[in-house]
Amino acid sequence: MSDLLGILKQQGQSEEFDAIKIALASPELIRSWSYGEVKKPETINYRTFKPERDGLFCAKTFGPVKDYECLCGKYKRLKHRGVICEKCGVELALAKVRRERMGHIELASPVAHIWFLKSLPSRIGLLLDMTLRDIERVLYFEAFVVVDPGMTELERGQLLNDEAYLDAMEQYGDEFDARMGAEAIRDLLRQIDLEDEIRNLREELPTTNSETKIKKITKRLKLLEAFYESGNKPEWMIMDVLPVLPPDLRPLVPLDGGRFATSDLNDLYRRVINRNNRLKRLLDLNAPDIIVRNEKRMLQESVDALLDNGRRGRAITGTNKRPLKSLADMIKGKQGRFRQNLLGKRVDYSGRSVIVVGPTLKLHQCGLPKKMALELFKPFIFSKLEFRGLATTIKAAKKMVEREESVVWDILDDVIREHPILLNRAPTLHRLGIQAFEPVLIEGKAIQLHPLVCTAYNADFDGDQMAVHVPLTLEAQLEARSLMMSTNNILSPASGEPIIVPSQDVVLGLYYLTREKVNALGEGKIYSSAQEAQNFYEAGHLDIHAKIKIRMPKEDGETGYHLVETTVGRAILAEILPKGMPFDYINRTMTKKVISKVIDSCYRKFGLKETVIFADQLMYTGFKYATRSGASIGIEDMEIPDDKASIIEHADNEVREIESQFRSGLVTNGERYNKVIDIWSRTNELVAKSMMSKIATEEVADAKGNKVRQESFNPIFMMADSGARGSAAQIRQLAGMRGLMAAPDGSIIETPITANFREGLNVFQYFISTHGARKGLADTALKTANSGYLTRRLVDVAQDVVITEDDCGTDTGILMQPLIEGGDIVEPLHERVLGRVVASDVYIPTQTEPVVKAGTLLDEEWVEKLEKHGVDQVMVRSPITCQTRFGLCAKCYGRDLARGHLVNTGEAVGIIAAQSIGEPGTQLTMRTFHIGGAASRATAANNIQIKTKGVIRLHNIKTVTHENKNLVAVSRSGEVTIVDEFGRERERYKVPYGAVISAQDNSPVEAGQVIATWDPHTHPVISEVSGRLKFVDLIDGITMNRQTDELTGLSNIVIIDAKQRSAAGRDLRPMVKLVTDEGDDIYLAGTNVPAQYYLPVDAIVNFEDRSLVGIGDVIARIPQERSKTRDITGGLPRVADLFEARKPKDSAVMAEVSGLVNFGKETKGKRRLIINVSEDQCHEELIPKWRHISVFEGEHVERGEIIAEGALNPHDILRLLGVGALANYIVNEVQDVYRLQGVKINDKHIEVIVRQMLRKRVITFAGDSKFLVGEQVEESAMLQENDKLLAEGKQIARGTPILLGITKASLATESFISAASFQETTRVLTEAAVSGKVDELRGLKENVMVGRLIPAGTGYTYHQSRKAKRARVAAGGDSSATHTVTASDVEHALSEALNADNHEH
């Protein structure tokens, strides 16, 4: 029997391949694939259902329909295997050969492959140096092309229309050869001598000067070299023979009622065959030229449609007006081959069900319904039944299981013990969306989930479903247990903070348990142990909140005991603390933040096991006391503050006051609106404050009968205060006032909702509430998709970043400083550098020895040391500066956040980075509607008040001194910082244009001092010199209006919008100049620039013509726009823009060189700014006049300094300031968005993505390399080429880094398989085929698609050993070492075993 099995074994290809190459197929190759020609368009006989001979389903060509059975039925059964029936010509084989055998169609006339013709840039066009339109005219028989000019004056490749052709024929006769159609193009392609062309172009390159020509030549050169090196022949882009897909991949399925469902490909093939046969007949008949031509054109069109329907002209539609799905459509898009079948497959041994909460489970368990378990573990049960001799055959075992005999349940218990299963909840946004658990069999039909893992899954129990998967092999079970078990995933890979943190009820229970109450039963008593106190409480002699004293063992390694003041509840909690954990960790009121910290420090001090047990105990305790507390929401608990009415009345009066000011013309409508919004924002804060103080505290009598205040036990307050549920903002809406609402366009409606939910809303208030509520829901739906797409792009760009070595040996890194915004340190240095490796020694001024040596991994202890020594900047290693060629090194990455130690080799840090950034995106986008659209707008800031004592430093601020000795800022990007006595920066503030600064540079300041003030509602225009005002182009009624105030009689001048002016005033540019009394221009100090200020629309001028103005006076003010609400809506697109490296609109102009500024001659709409580097070297910028230029004449600027205000362009930052500055910029900007939402992500994830955006180089100097100047190449490719050149002693190539957006970077990866499965499949494959690309299968995606272990994690070692083995073979080592067990050996062994069994029976 073993021989038989050996014969049966399909002669499959060997599994061992290391790369995949894509190339053009030559006609010979296509014929060699084919098992026969398809000559007829018939498919199957509608009566017999047998395939027609020579048709599209022909059994002779493609193989038998049934296993080992020929069509006419002469030969049947296995014994005739391989026989070819002489009657019907069918070879006897397995029916599945119909999935792999191809046919071909011999075309009567060659046709062009549409991908190489129409996929831009057109490859055929580039090779022939003709435009796409011209080639199409030839191919679709509208014009002749000269193939061989002979001795005539015509040129090769010249197009001739019919008349020109006839004229030429008359003139030259047979001297020349001009034809039309694909044959002509094929002959032209054949004539190209690649070597010659390449040589000529290479010689031509240095001599040309025009940019466009150089671009064109390099494009052609690259294509020609690609053809030359890959061995592809240009004429193969024109096809003489068309391959036919195996029939089982384009099936024809009979439906009931005699109709057939067919794949669209069959229709497309039929059209091709019909037209081809008709063309053959016409050619045999010597039909007139015009008819043949038309038929050839139709053949070309039908082949186009088969390959890529709809690429040219209108798509061919089927019977139901739907475009037919062509071969190209089969592979692209979400439903295409790549994404549907290769990257994601359905798996066996899986099930799904609704989840319910399992509060009694341990952290590593989940409840699995018996019914599901029985089905999922069937094969294991069968084998166990046989093994124990309870069933003789598999069939018998099956019957036993179906009958659910009692012994089956015992065996199921046995099988399930210690066999982990995987639980997954869609959407799986990060790796914690799939975790392993040990199943516990339960009755019922719902899966039970442990409450602590809900955060990771983002699961709730309102009907969520989860899927179960069974790891089958031993290796899979091992991995599930050691890597994926929920107990091994306590920390979040995104931030390194615990993700197994109690939430909601548990938090509420622990909070209630650890609260203090004044004058509770048993206050002031002393107990010998926590256990004793607990006993007294259980007996009812103690209140759980009573303040008592307990004798506790001393901590920090000291022996003996001491008395601790605590409460009964905290003593109860102390019982579950791990041994050695200090009691003062929990001797406080436990809020969610505190609990998270406790779990974190437990993990760092006592390790995994203790933490898991502790977390479980916390949960049980929390649930128990949440139940005991009886905390619930009652309408009485929403206490409305008594002074609410008076606060609101006061606000109404203020608003009335402003309305009257507006009516009398003192303020503009915009200012009025802004001030009203401000009043209501402030009022809302006041009501909220008053309400919180009422809800948060209560007055009680203490033991002596005195009145004291304590934190209240109001359940709503407790829920918010503990962090269990709800926030101050929500309580404010329940018991304060709902406040301002946003209109559908995002602007704020100026009438707020003064009612709260307890009082109830009236119809008008309800109506304006609906805007925000609906917007929230609509946003959610739209943005979930956007966020998912962002994650997909991130994963794609970073998928092949794997830790490949321990240390790349670089000594560069990036400089880390604390992040300071305003008066707050947003992220202290110790948080930013935790888990990083130091790049260079860290010193402090007082010591000569370094505090930290280079190469140290900074853990908690080290960062405490840094903090203690007051270090405020550290150079750390970063993924961006890592020198590893493929992947990253462990030292540059630092700590594995989810494990807390240096990252292992093989860790797929790219995917983790992408998930960490993408996952909160979805969270954030889903989070818009929770506050119900209430507009949260901070009251506009109007001053800088500092918080710490220190010295003030001004940065980038241009100031002028007002006559009252104050400084007035006249620059936009200025900042002030406060520095402490060690010279460390403590606070940092932006200073707006027009701010009055009341402290001098480098002067000492006290805490609480106000150092700058400004008007938040207007942009001022400040005079920088003193003199008389002169109006230019300010004409009453044309460019400006006068508004007189009735009360004061003062008049203001307001500029009119250019769009609303009469024709006369369209082109006028209103501005004010400062002149001397004689009327001469006054220049800005130290420059030759006149002091003149253009006035934008709506500007209000405060002075009259010819009035005197002092330095620092406000000449005009521009009311600010209505403020829109900030929502993550701005956030997610912002993150996408940063990662896509989009150029911002009106981006800032940065100085290209360092030097002195002066202004040259102005053009019509622009100013010329010249930066002089030296006598003979300068750089010019043309800047539109409306842009605000932030440098003066004669000022010195550094390279990369901002000259004209605007959003920064990341490409400029990279070019002018380098990689470090760019990394800093992107990291900080992305973090700003997430921080606004309170999401923590570690910087290194963003850095990994930035590294991938920077992996290309633009060649600046080609040396002796194969690269061309201006070409974009992978850095690794450039370095490899340089290594080769160095070895040969030649000149190396040099390049500068270039920033690509994530989409572009994904499409530009080395691996064409990965790029094609991402986006623009056609373009990627066309390009790859032409250049004969080889995919080395380095990334994760490529390996998933060829069905291999990924080269990361546990698969990393497998790939390494394969590589090592290959190297040994290549080195001519021990050949026997290469002999590994192949599939056939295994089958052979199996058949032997089966035979042995047979003999025994």
From Swiss-Prot:
Keywords associated with the record: DNA-directed RNA polymerase, Magnesium, Metal-binding, Nucleotidyltransferase, Transcription, Transferase, Zinc
Reactions performed catalytically: RNA(n) + a ribonucleoside 5'-triphosphate = RNA(n+1) + diphosphate
Domain of life assignment: Bacteria
Which amino acids does the record list as binding Mg(2+)? 460, 462, 464
Leading EC class? transferase
Instruction: Identify the EC number(s).
Output: 2.7.7.6
Cite the binding residues for Zn(2+) 1.
Answer: 70, 72, 85, 88
Residues annotated for Zn(2+) 2 binding in this entry? 808, 882, 889, 892
Query: Which molecular function terms from Gene Ontology are attached?
Result: DNA binding; DNA-directed RNA polymerase activity; magnesium ion binding; zinc ion binding
Gene Ontology BP annotations: DNA-templated transcription
Instruction: Tell me which GO cellular component terms the UniProt record holds.
Output: DNA-directed RNA polymerase complex
Cofactor details (free text): Binds 1 Mg(2+) ion per subunit.
Under Gene3D superfamilies, the record lists:
1.10.132.30, 1.10.150.390, 1.10.1790.20, 1.10.40.90, 2.40.40.20, 2.40.50.100, RNA polymerase II, clamp domain, RNA polymerase Rpb1, domain 3
Physiological role = DNA-dependent RNA polymerase catalyzes the transcription of DNA into RNA using the four ribonucleoside triphosphates as substrates.
Q: Which family does it belong to?
A: Belongs to the RNA polymerase beta' chain family.
Q: How does it assemble?
A: The RNAP catalytic core consists of 2 alpha, 1 beta, 1 beta' and 1 omega subunit. When a sigma factor is associated with the core the holoenzyme is formed, which can initiate transcription.
What PANTHER family is this protein classified in?
Answer: DNA-DIRECTED RNA POLYMERASE, DNA-DIRECTED RNA POLYMERASE SUBUNIT BETA
For this entry, the protein name equals DNA-directed RNA polymerase subunit beta'
**Species annotation:** Legionella pneumophila (strain Lens)
